[in-house]
Amino acid sequence: MSITTSSNSETPLNTENIKDSSLPRIIFLHGFLGSGIDWVPIAQELENDYCCILVDLPGHGESDIEANGDPDLFFMETVDTLAEELSRSAAPEPCYLVGYSMGGRIALSLLLRYPELFEKAIIVSASPGLRTEEERLSRRESDEGIARKIERNFDGFIKAWYEQPLFASLKNHPIFKEVESERKINNPENLALALRLLGTGRQPSTWDELQQNRVPIQFFAGEKDLKFVEIGRQMVNLCPDSSLEIFAECGHTLHLENRELFLDRLTQFFNKHQ
């Protein structure tokens, strides 16, 4: 599955397919600093029942990124090209979608713009964006400062990034050292550009579109991630055919902190009425 990130760029997005492509497909979209590798342990548990497609988003993993065209259009161009490749793929039936954080924001835009492509979706620790242009401008300015830190001292940035309270439960988890090492595989210049082009400040708000949702969605949030618990509650109130699952004792990275529970909830939801 070859995906280009922009109508003005031929940069391919790297993907990895886990198992037979004739099985029902689940598309997995990772968060900022991650890659498709984040989903491999989960995909391996699902390989007897699903073809798991692990996407490296622009500027992450093996996917390059180029700053061609209007930066305000890049987010939705990424959404559009993902949808185009999915609609052109050999399997005609709708697929399942899972997105975390940055990948969750992209996934939510995909669902609302191209509902015919998807059977069900799980959105993890993500939001429909910022409601006002003033908020988006402020966020772009903040993200620019973060991008410069990435470019100046990548290792120092990674250390400081995971000092944030929303990652406290991950940092105390046995998996943290592995996660930290995987983050450092990424190219810092690409990550900085990805933040500038795919950050929340560049994302068009989809709050007003939630009421038009046509795809069954489960929103996941960690109990300790209070910001996204509240966002999840707000989304469920606006979004038809949706529900919120709160993961006890977990923070922002609940799919890493409690993979067993995540897999259980995913299979329950995707297998229901299959």
Language-model-derived ranges and their functions:
Residues 1-27, 47-51, 86, 91-92, ...:
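Alpha/beta-hydrolase fold catalytic core
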Residues 16-65:
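Conserved HGGG/HGGXW glycine-rich cap/lid loop of the alpha/beta-hydrolase fold
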Residues 40-44, 53-98, 264:
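Active-site loop/oxyanion-hole signature of alpha/beta-hydrolase fold enzymes
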Residues 99-103, 107:
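Gly/Ala-rich beta-loop-alpha elbow adjacent to hydrolase catalytic centers
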Residues 112, 120-150:
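Flexible "cap/lid" loop of the alpha/beta hydrolase fold
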Residues 184, 189-234:
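Conserved serine/cysteine hydrolase catalytic core
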Residues 236-252:
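Catalytic histidine neighborhood in serine/cysteine hydrolases
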Residues 250-259, 263:
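Catalytic histidine-centered segment of alpha/beta-hydrolase-like enzymes
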